[in-house]
Amino acid sequence: MFTGIVEEMGTVKAIRKGPHSAVVEIQAQVVLEDLHIGDSIAVNGVCLTATAFSPAGFTADVMHETLNRSALALLRPGSRVNLERALAAGGRFGGHIVAGHVDGVGTVQRITRDDNAVWYTIAAGPEILRYVVEKGSIAIDGISLTVARVEPDRFAVSVIPHTAAVTLLGRR
């Protein structure tokens, strides 16, 4: 289980795709602290299991179902990713419960800025929107956010400048 509070952005060093799965190598620092083989790490909100690690990063397997339901299939060497370690019992709980089991992928339709926020309008199909509730929690690329508006074919979230600066959302 995760909280949606991104600990760092890592970089994809390599990705080896097979016909039905992939192996991804990610350069990281913070999430390596006290890492063990078999530990869970959220990569853009997707729960992956560390299968190997070094002082420079970790490796994880990505199953066929995960490639089909998430945007991890789009990763390339050099891609930046949001990373978070699994929540430790008794640990600080700053976001919302994020299981790391992805329901689907939306598309950023519009980005607008106002004084202290960046608004993201995201198009999504009914298979995703049936789970989206105004003022409810949602994880986008693993980031804990609150839904500000819901429309028949899209929803919107508002992001503070700090969150935009330390996550992938700020690079869109």
What are the functions of these language-model segments?
Residues 1-172:
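Conserved loop->alpha-helix
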